[in-house]
């Protein structure tokens, strides 16, 4: 099949999926259709949509990363091994982060700390865990740099996040405050946050973040990666762009983890914006001096 035909086919598939998704969401958001959080159940075992969304996001990101390996001095077998350890570190980081900001509860029920199947993972913790593992792994391997791996990682991470966020959709969680906007999302009574029992429709913040993540992915993967002049640009821009979107979206959510009187995700987002901006400014300054 020629390149032009592949592009046309891809556009047709994307349009078909988009149209189908629009009508599906219209039914769910109106409350005429209630989704369940699992695909099937055998005894006490449930195959949950949340797990499928997370796994699908990782798989798609991995496939796209493999396609870009020619741009990086990283061996395919080391990408595979690094992915495994990155997933382990990401899960641990996501859980540790969540437990820290819910310590009042977990200090009373320490046996719940390891029971991640009861819920409780935070994306910022997952990112920090994965980045720490990338740093350690790059030092162990020695032949590629930390920024080589982080650029490859952050070029596909937004798409994995965009897909993973749909797990929140099936769980009716991570939604925002009540709203009357046309795209408001119906939440069943049993899934509503305490104090919002009489409210029926809420901001679909999972969708906001998913769309924002897709936008970041398209920008980084198809534009920045092909035009960057220095390793580290993709990583710095990811930190800035994701954090800007997350800061705003977090202001709408009802289930934010708190750091004292502040939303933890917003505090972390501000820090990451400054780190990303300083990093990007350093890279631009470095390339500018080199050109001169």
From Swiss-Prot:
Function of the molecule: Catalyzes the transfer of the diacylglyceryl group from phosphatidylglycerol to the sulfhydryl group of the N-terminal cysteine of a prolipoprotein, the first step in the formation of mature lipoproteins.
Protein family according to the UniProt entry: Belongs to the Lgt family.
Pathway field: Protein modification; lipoprotein biosynthesis (diacylglyceryl transfer)
EC code(s) of this entry: 2.5.1.145
Enzyme class: transferase
Keyword Transmembrane helix: yes
Gene Ontology terms describing biological process: lipoprotein biosynthetic process
A GO MF term: phosphatidylglycerol-prolipoprotein diacylglyceryl transferase activity
One cellular-component annotation, GO: plasma membrane
Keywords assigned by UniProt, alphabetized: Cell inner membrane, Cell membrane, Membrane, Transferase, Transmembrane, Transmembrane helix
Cited InterPro entries: Lgt
Native species: Fervidobacterium nodosum (strain ATCC 35602 / DSM 5306 / Rt17-B1)
One Pfam family in the UniProt entry: LGT
Subcellular location: Cell inner membrane
Protein name: Phosphatidylglycerol--prolipoprotein diacylglyceryl transferase
TM region positions: 7-27, 45-65, 83-103, 116-136, 204-224, 264-284
Binding sites annotated in the UniProt record for a 1,2-diacyl-sn-glycero-3-phospho-(1'-sn-glycerol): 165
Membrane topology listed for this record: Multi-pass membrane protein
HAMAP family attached to this UniProt entry: Lgt (MF_01147)
Keyword Transmembrane annotated: yes
């Amino acid at each position: 099949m020629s390149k032009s035909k592949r592009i046309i086919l891809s556009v047709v598939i994307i349009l078909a999926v988009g149209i189908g998704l629009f009508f599906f969401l219209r039914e769910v958001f109106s409350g005429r259709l209630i989704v369940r959080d699992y695909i099937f159940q055998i005894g006490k075992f449930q195959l949950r949509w949340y797990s499928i969304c997370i796994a699908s996001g990782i798989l798609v990101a991995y496939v796209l990363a493999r396609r870009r390996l020619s741009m990086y001095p990283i061996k395919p077998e080391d990408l595979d091994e690094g992915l495994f350890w990155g997933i382990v570190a990401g899960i641990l980081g996501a859980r540790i982060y969540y437990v820290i900001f819910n310590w009042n509860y977990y200090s009373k029920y320490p046996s719940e700390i390891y029971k991640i199947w009861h819920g409780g993972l935070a994306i910022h913790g997952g990112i920090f865990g994965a980045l720490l593992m990338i740093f350690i792994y790059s030092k162990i391997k020695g032949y590629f740099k930390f920024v080589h791996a982080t650029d490859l990682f952050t070029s596909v991470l937004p798409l994995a996040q965009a897909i993973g966020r749909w797990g929140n959709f099936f769980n009716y969680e991570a939604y925002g405050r009540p709203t009357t906007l046309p795209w408001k999302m119906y939440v069943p009574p049993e899934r509503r946050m305490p104090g919002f029992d009489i409210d029926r429709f809420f901001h679909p913040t999972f969708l906001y973040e998913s769309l924002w993540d897709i936008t970041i992915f398209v920008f980084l993967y198809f534009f920045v990666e092909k035009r960057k002049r220095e390793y580290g640009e993709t990583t710095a821009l990811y930190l800035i762009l994701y954090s800007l979107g997350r800061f705003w979206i977090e202001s709408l959510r009802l289930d934010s983890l708190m750091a004292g009187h502040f939303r933890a995700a917003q505090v972390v987002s501000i820090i990451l914006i400054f780190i990303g901006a300083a990093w990007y400014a350093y890279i631009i300054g470095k390339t500018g001096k080199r050109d001169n």
